Amino acid sequence: MIEHPYPQGTDDWLEARRGVITASRAKDARDRDSKGKPSAKMLNYAMDTARERCGGKAAPVYQNAAMRMGSEEEQFAAIEYMARTGRALSEAFFITTDDRKFGLSLDRWVDREAAIEVKTMVSSATLFKAMVEGDISEYRDQCVFALWMLRLQWVDLCLWAPDLPNPLKVIRITRDEAEIQRLEDDMVAFDRLVCQYEASLRKAMGTEPTAAPPWEAPTPAASPAPTVAPGAIPAPAF
C-alpha cells in the first residue's frame, strides 16, 4: 500500500487520486439499471477514470454547501466519537494499492486495524432515511471497500446530526467475507471496463498502452520435470 500524506483538496492530493478507483465511488462502480446492465453512472465513471489514466482530467465534482458542511463537521463528529467510546483516533491520508488502481481516504484510523467513516446528516431526507429507517445503502459499499482493501476488522459508520440533542449514531460494519468477495469481484470487473476504455482512447490518440494489471498477466507454463533414462538411475547401495 502507498500512503499519500497530502492535505485533502490540495493539488498533490488531487494528483494522487487521478485515475484511481476510489471507495467513495464504489457504489457508482457497481451501479446497474433495472435489467442488470451497467448504468449510465457506472459507464460515465469508467470513462472518467480511463481519461485520467491517459493523462487527462475529468470534469471536477461540484461541491455544494451541504458537502462543504459535511467536510467541516467531520472533526467534531470524531471528537464526539472519542468521548463516547474512549477510543483514540489518528489522522488518515489517501491510500492506494501498489499498482494505484484502487484507493481510499479514511476519515480516521482506530488503532490501525479499524476506522470510522463520518456522514453528516445535512438534509432531513438523509437524516430520516439513515438514522430513523436504518437504510445505510448509500454508504455501505464505501465501508466494505475499506474492509476489503485495508483488511480492516470493522468500520464504524458515524451518522452525525450536529443540530440534534443526541447528534451521533454509530453503526458498526464488520467483516462478512462473502460480501467482501462480491465487492472485490465487482471492483476487478469494473477495472477491466476502465482498461477497455483506456485502451480504446489510447488507440484513438496513438499512444502506448499501459502494462496489464497483475490479475490479467498470463501465467507462465510450468517447466516439465526432467526425465531420466532407466539405465542412468544408480543402483541402491544395499
Q: Positions of the model-derived regions?
A:
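Charged phosphate-binding loop/patch that engages nucleotide di/tri-phosphates or the phosphate backbone
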Residues: 191-215
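Amphipathic alpha-helical interaction segments
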Residues: 21-22, 147, 156, 198, ...
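Generic structural marker for isolated residues within well-ordered, non-membrane alpha-helices
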Residues: 47, 78, 143
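Nucleic-acid nuclease catalytic cores
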Residues: 85-198
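Acidic-basic catalytic patches of nuclease active cores, encompassing PD-(D/E)XK
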Residues: 66-89
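Context-gated lysine
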Residues: 27, 35-37, 41, 57, ...
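Charged, glycine-rich intrinsically disordered N-terminal tails and low-complexity linkers that flank
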Residues: 1-72, 208-238
